[in-house]
């Protein structure tokens, strides 16, 4: 990113499906199990039973934001035999592979976003919920000067909202 230019933030891709780290999207069939297998393989990850089950829970419902604890609870209800540590490890592997985007709200809460396109978020404080900002034309007018030897890897904007009193 050239810091002297304005940075335009684009919206979701057409169907909200995660894009592999290589920048290519696997062909989708509409079968979540097959699609998860294709996404994992395209990202260079072996489709283990646990990755497949967690991937199906993550990506089978479209674009969404989950914490590790939320996914673990879903897995437990779906009778997927995984530990919380396995959920954390899998989420980090999927993030490293470019299939998820990690969004830290504060020092204690991290969400994993299945929409890896460049976009920003509202954080609903009362509900502890992360929501995509729907404006695909949101633009940051001026970027800060970057210290020598560094480059901007990503810009995250989280607008915190609370109900009016």
Each model region followed by its residue ranges:
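Short amphipathic alpha-helical elements of helix-turn-helix/winged-helix folds
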Residues: 39, 56-61, 74
């Amino acid at each position: 990113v050239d810091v002297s230019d304005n940075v335009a933030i684009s919206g979701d891709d057409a169907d909200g499906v995660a894009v592999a780290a290589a920048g290519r999207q696997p062909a989708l069939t509409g079968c979540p199990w097959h699609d998860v297998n294709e996404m994992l393989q395209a990202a260079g990850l072996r489709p283990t039973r646990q990755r497949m089950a967690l991937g199906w829970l993550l990506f089978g419902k479209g674009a969404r934001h989950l914490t590790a604890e939320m996914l673990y609870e879903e897995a437990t209800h779906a009778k997927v035999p995984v530990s919380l540590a396995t959920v954390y490890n899998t989420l980090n592997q999927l993030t490293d592979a470019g299939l998820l985007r990690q969004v830290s709200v504060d020092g204690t809460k991290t969400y994993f976003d299945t929409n890896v396109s460049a976009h920003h978020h509202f954080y609903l404080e009362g509900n502890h919920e992360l929501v995509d900002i729907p404006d695909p034309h949101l633009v940051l007018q001026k970027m800060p000067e970057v210290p020598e030897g560094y480059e901007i890897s990503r810009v995250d904007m989280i607008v915190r909202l609370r109900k009016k009193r």
